[in-house]
Structure formats: structure tokens, C-alpha cells
Amino acid sequence: MIKPANLRACLEAAIPELVRDPQRLRLTVEKGFVTSTGAVSATGAVSFLYNYTLTALLLDFDGADAPFLAIVRWLAVNERELLQSWVGGKQGLPFQVDILDAGKVDLEIEIPLTERVICTPAAGGGVTFVHPSTVPRCPRN
């Protein structure tokens, strides 16, 4: 899975205090499952799809707007279909907030993600894993 590390980099680019204190951002993969048709191509390739929830926990944070903006911008580039499925406002990013003192919050955001993996036989044995069209990009903040 390569999207979690990329989203972390994008959040750090948008919120510099996460670079200064990286312990304030925790990312965990939860509720994961793999799907596949099991079909084998003429070249022997098989593919599968990671489906999971990436939970971003921002600790002792002073506002929710910046993380949500960074995540929505990232999703627009890396999970466009997810954003398009939200049209009508009936779905979105689940989140929870623990309100602390002095205007600080702990913010937990659940982000449903997918990543396709193609597994092809490698010359000389072994397997090559490719994540097509899953080269995550960090949009300009």
C-alpha cells in the first residue's frame, strides 16, 4: 500500500507543524479486505484490489479546516471516483472530534481507499508487483 505514506506527505506539506512534531499525526489502516476475480491474463498476470479505511488521527490540533482541505484536494487527484460518489451530500468522510482545552482538538478522520495491484511472473522466477494508476500525487496546497 502506497497511498498512506503519500497522504502523510501531503498533510505535512499543508500543515507544517506536522513536520516539526510528526507524533501529532498517526495513520492506521483498518477494515481492510482484498478482492479479486482470480482471472489470469494471457501473460500469467493476476490482479487484486486493496480496499481499506485509512484512519488519520491528528492530535492536539488547533482547527479542522486545514486537514480536511488537504485531504479533499488529495482525494480529488487520487480517488476522484470517491468524491464523485458523494454528490448529493449523503456520504462523505466520517470523523470524530475530541474537544480539548485551549481550543485544541484531537481529530480522527476515516478515509476509504482502494489500490489495485497487478502481479506478473518475473523473468527468472518470482513475481513483479505493479500498482497501476496508483502513483499518488500531492496537489499543490
Predicted regions located by residue number:
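Long, contiguous binding/interaction regions
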Residues: 1-49, 57-141
